[in-house]
Structures are given as C-alpha cells and as structure tokens.
C-alpha cells in the first residue's frame, strides 16, 4: 500500500465516522428517524411503510419499539413504551379516518375484546370528532407508556384524554398488524420485513 491509498482510507474513515449515528428511512417523502424517545426511553424504528387505498397514498406510518420485533405476538408483548407515527400524505376527513379505524378494529378484535375497551374506543372517536380534517403533512402520533396509557398527539400537541388500558393500544396496533390488516403491504413493512 502506498501513502496515497492509506490517506484515502483515512479520509474515508473520517467521513464515515462524522455521519450522524441515526439514519432516516424515507417512505413516500416522509423521513422516519431510526430512533425516538417516549417517556424518557429510547425507541428503535421497527419498520415503516405506506398505507394506500386503491391507488392513492393515504399516509406513511412507522412503528417504534424498545427492541426490534418481527412477529405480531412479539410486538404486542414487548415491554416498555411504544409509538406509532403517522404522517398524512393527503387530506382525509376525520369521519373517513375514524370509519377506517373502526373497521380495522372490528376486523381484528373479537366482540368481547371490544366490549372491554369500549370506553376508550369512544374517547378515541371523540378525538376525531374534534378535528374535521386530517390534512396533508399532519403528524398523528399514538404513544403507549406503561402505567399511564395511550396518548395521542396531532402535530406535537396532545389531543384527547389518556386511555389507560394496554389492551386498547394492542387493539389499535392490530389494525395494521392483525390477521386482517387495513393494508396488507403495510403490515410486513411495520414488522421490518421490507
């Protein structure tokens, strides 16, 4: 090896070392950082993908967990906080978003499960009743914090009341990860398979 090759190698190593420790995954122009923090705990991006309806791009979604998981059972059982981050890619009336939420919940939970979390489902519905339209670029975040509950944020601002039952958060996750997900290509993306 000559001096020039050694120098090039050192320069390349220095440039690589100066890159940020986090990288972003791009989904339809929406960047999802590799890490985020919920309730003071670092979370890792488990996966991110695109929700489409017919040919329309509706939103990009990312799932953050304390550790990467590749099965639905593991995701639902993982301890610690969790986050679902959604960025709208088009305007959607909240009535339509709420209807899709209800359909996804009904398709992936039993009647008994829904009855146990009915008060929280109603609270969640009230959140969308207060927001007439989710606009392109809006960021909806659903955080689960152990011993506290589920808190929703719209563009970084808390919306709605805390919903305390983990069964509710798991039911919401099954909208995307259940046996009948709202988008069959989004499920493997959130599980980090794509």
Regions inferred by a protein language model and the residue ranges of each:
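N-terminal signal peptide c-region/cleavage motif recognized by signal peptidases
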Residues: 18-20
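Flexible glycine-rich active-site/ligand-binding loops centered on an Asp-His dyad
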Residues: 159-186
